[in-house]
Amino acid sequence: MYRLMQPSDRAAVVALWQKERGDTAEFINTAMDRFAGEQNVYVAEENGQIEAAALAVPVTLQGRPGNYLFGLCGQGSLILAGLVDTLCAQQKLRGAGFTVAAPTSPERAALLQDKGFQKAFALRCLPREVERNLW
């Protein structure tokens, strides 16, 4: 079942996030409370356990409301795909015109691409000569 996180789910979400991403509990709680807001944390529950989680951080781009998919964690591509679908659909109902994401691995990038996300830009390295700037 995909749904919004309830306060009673917080410890399980923090534990899952720490296991998957290695962040501190302080960082995770700050992300949920101050970055996304508790009302924008989505979870996938299976057999009474939290199996996946993601934040839908509210953003505005050139006056258009949308969200930033952040902290996607969990195992199983079907569970993660369902969570992304639910998050995007619910945010669209709330008026979000777009969802952006920065995948943390090639596997996550492939999952998001399968869900219709497109690469908008990529980081690239431009080599150039560096001169000492001592005078």
Predicted regions span which residues?
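Active-site rim helix/loop that mediates acceptor-substrate recognition in acyltransferases
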Residues: R21-E46
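A short, internal acetyl-CoA/4′-phosphopantetheine-binding micro-motif in the GNAT/acyltransferase core
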Residues: Y68-I79
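A conserved short alpha-helix in the GNAT/GCN5 acetyltransferase fold that borders
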Residues: L83-K92, A109, Q113
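Conserved beta-strand in the GNAT
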Residues: V43, Q49-V59, Y68
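Conserved GNAT acetyl-CoA-binding A-motif
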Residues: Q91-T104
